[in-house]
């Protein structure tokens, strides 16, 4: 059996259920994430954002995939909300911030996608642009919320050719999709920027030595770009699962 990869999930409210069920919500993880893990040889396990469970979940997984989703509450990086802030989910925010703390303490390999990169950055001490169009000072800001289907690329990113990301992707020029209005502002000190869009927006970050700590985050939705048109994005899942497998082996003999 492959390594167990925890995949974070979101909460969706169903008004029709609220009349008959106390919680009135259901947990959702997009299938693209779990299929991406499974195709890479991992065993995906969806992690519902239940208060008080983060530490126990961290103890049982070999890798963590932080999925995309809603905006992160800016109070986690010391700011008040701007008018352009979208919906936040307090339960999910609190759970994921605690979960990241516990998995990093244990050395669990972490892969963040879109919101996942943002959560990683904030958990490690960084900050975010709450809304790129209103806060990012660049005349050449490109559209980071595409209207095309998620599996279609909409802009290019340049990868640092000295980065481990370049080795994983086997390329320094990537075509990516874009579904976000928040982004990394001040990067957390342990991380390095390894990919940027043409407007300077951070598109990927990593821990400088992945053999020491496997921490990688990308701003694009790699889970939706694993088809034959963009096969290089599968490499991210493959590398993460491989790191999780090594973590599982070390844990077994500890």
Predicted ranges, named:
Residues 1-111, 122, 129, 133-168, ...:
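N-terminal beta1-alpha1 cap of cysteine-dependent amidohydrolase-like domains
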Residues 112, 117:
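Glycine-rich beta-to-alpha active-site loop
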Residues 215-219:
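Active-site-proximal beta-strand elements of phosphoester/diester hydrolases
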């Amino acid at each position: 059996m492959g390594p167990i990869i925890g995949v974070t999930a979101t909460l969706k409210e169903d008004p029709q259920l609220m009349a008959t069920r106390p919680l009135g919500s259901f947990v959702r993880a997009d299938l693209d994430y779990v299929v991406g893990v499974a195709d890479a040889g991992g065993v995906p396990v969806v992690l519902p954002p239940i208060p008080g469970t983060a530490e126990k979940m961290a103890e049982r997984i070999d890798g963590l995939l932080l999925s995309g989703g809603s905006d992160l509450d800016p109070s986690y990086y010391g700011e008040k909300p701007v008018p352009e802030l979208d919906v936040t989910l307090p339960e999910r925010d609190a759970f994921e911030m605690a979960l990241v703390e516990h998995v990093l303490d244990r050395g669990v390999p972490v892969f963040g996608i879109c919101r996942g990169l943002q959560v990683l950055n904030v958990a490690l001490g960084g900050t975010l642009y709450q809304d790129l169009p209103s806060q990012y000072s660049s005349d050449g800001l490109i559209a980071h919320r595409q209207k095309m289907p998620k599996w279609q690329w909409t802009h290019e990113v340049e990868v640092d050719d000295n980065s481990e990301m370049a080795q994983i992707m086997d390329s320094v020029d990537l075509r990516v999709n874009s579904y976000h209005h928040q982004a990394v502002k001040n990067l957390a000190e342990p991380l390095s920027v390894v990919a940027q869009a043409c407007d300077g927006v951070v598109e990927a970050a990593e821990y400088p030595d992945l053999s020491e700590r496997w921490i990688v985050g990308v701003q694009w939705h790699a889970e939706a770009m694993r088809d034959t048109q963009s096969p290089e994005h599968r490499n991210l899942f493959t590398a993460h699962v491989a790191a999780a497998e090594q973590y599982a082996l070390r844990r077994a003999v500890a």
